[in-house]
Regions:
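Glycine-enriched, solvent-exposed interface loops adjoining structured elements
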Residues: 4-176
């Protein structure tokens, strides 16, 4: 059995033009780049690759029920919260993912009496994946009553195939 050698940016754009039987005057690089980006994101979503699994450790701010997800996050796989405020070892719990409306109904306030160790999380805020301030946010409930250590397990968005990044893991191993 032979292994496909994969694509470079140049060979893939040529293959797209050959398949559609049009040249670069009709099928511009802007259009083919969007095809490529959409395909890469679909592959990453449907066939998670171990090399792109990451973890981020941090601490909650007492009374603050939202945190930024890490830069270039494609999706969050899970969130652990530790009993400790200084270590990501020992007793911990996995937060249960819920809809934002569930969390708002579960604990409608961040007042001191409503705080505790978070049990639930929800995603919100839309995401472009470029930086930690625009990669979406996590909403937790209840709001933390101390600076618990957390660990976010997530799938990252690798640099995509482009004229300046001519090969990627996906272009080499997901050729057809």
């Amino acid at each position: 059995a032979s292994i496909m050698s994969g694509f470079t940016y140049a060979t893939l754009t040529t293959a797209i033009q050959d398949y559609t039987e049009v040249d670069s005057n009709v099928l511009t690089s802007t259009i083919t780049n969007q095809f490529i980006e959409n395909a890469e994101l679909r592959i990453l979503r449907d066939a998670p690759i171990d090399a792109y699994k990451k973890q981020k450790i941090g601490n909650f701010v007492t009374g603050q029920d939202t945190i930024n997800v890490p830069a270039k996050t494609l999706f969050v796989k899970g969130v652990q919260v530790y009993d400790s405020t200084s270590a990501s070892t020992g007793n911990n719990r996995w937060l249960e993912k819920k809809d934002e409306s569930y969390l708002q109904e579960y604990v409608p306030s961040t007042e001191t009496a409503a705080r505790g160790q978070p049990k639930y999380y929800a995603m919100f805020g839309g995401a472009t994946g470029v930086s930690d301030t625009d990669s979406g946010r996590l909403f937790v409930a209840p709001a933390p009553d101390t600076t618990y250590t957390f660990k976010i397990h997530y799938e990252t968005i690798p640099d995509g195939l482009s004229s300046s990044n001519t090969t990627t893991y996906i272009s080499q191993y997901f050729g057809n």
